[in-house]
UniProtKB/Swiss-Prot annotation:
UniProt name for this protein: Large ribosomal subunit protein uL22
Entry annotated with the keyword Protein biosynthesis: no
CDD domains in alphabetical order: Ribosomal_L22
Annotated Gene3D superfamilies: Ribosomal protein L22/L17
Keyword match NADP: no
Annotated source species: Methanopyrus kandleri (strain AV19 / DSM 6324 / JCM 9639 / NBRC 100938)
Similarity section: Belongs to the universal ribosomal protein uL22 family.
Length: 159
């Protein structure tokens, strides 16, 4: 019998206090794993309200996300936080991560947690499967056109 894939969070459930945490997990988002990773790194540890406002500013192109790992040929930005220079405005990834944060906030509200005291304890982006596609070209050839997907997990904790 083939093994089935079991989805789980990076943090084991024994390390979490169910009374003070809320979780959300979205799979197979059609966003760049590199953009998602950089956004997750930028907002990890932030209070929830501040993280949501940061993502809204990224979508409006008012503040850039610092690109620390995937920064080759990334231009320097004036709209970036002090201490870093290379950055981008990954709107699509920011919109999807904002949606995941809103799901986690709704879960926290359902559990009776105070949403004003929530902060992002854990957020991570993992590569998902690649959706394969082909573009027909001249003389009967074809070029691969692959779409990466990303899994995002969020754990909010009440302070």
């Amino acid at each position: 019998m083939p093994k089935t894939k079991h989805w789980h969070y990076s943090i084991p459930p024994e390390e979490l206090d169910d009374e003070r945490t809320a979780k959300a997990f979205i799979r197979e988002l059609r966003i760049s794993p590199k953009h998602a990773r950089e956004i997750c790194r930028a907002i990890r540890g932030m209070p929830l309200d501040r993280a949501k406002e940061f993502l809204r500013r990224v979508i409006r192109k008012e503040e850039a996300v610092p690109f620390r790992k995937h920064k080759k040929k990334v231009p320097h930005r004036r709209q970036i936080r002090p201490g870093w220079d290379a950055g981008r405005f990954p709107e699509k990834a920011a919109r999807e991560i904002l949606r995941v944060l809103e799901h986690a906030e709704a879960n926290a509200e359902y559990k009776g947690l105070d949403t004003d005291r929530l902060y992002i304890k854990h957020i991570a982006a993992h590569k998902g499967r690649v959706i394969r596609g082909w573009i027909p070209r001249a003389f009967g050839r074809a070029t691969p056109f692959n779409t990466p997907t990303t899994h995002i997990e969020v754990i909010l904790e009440e302070r």
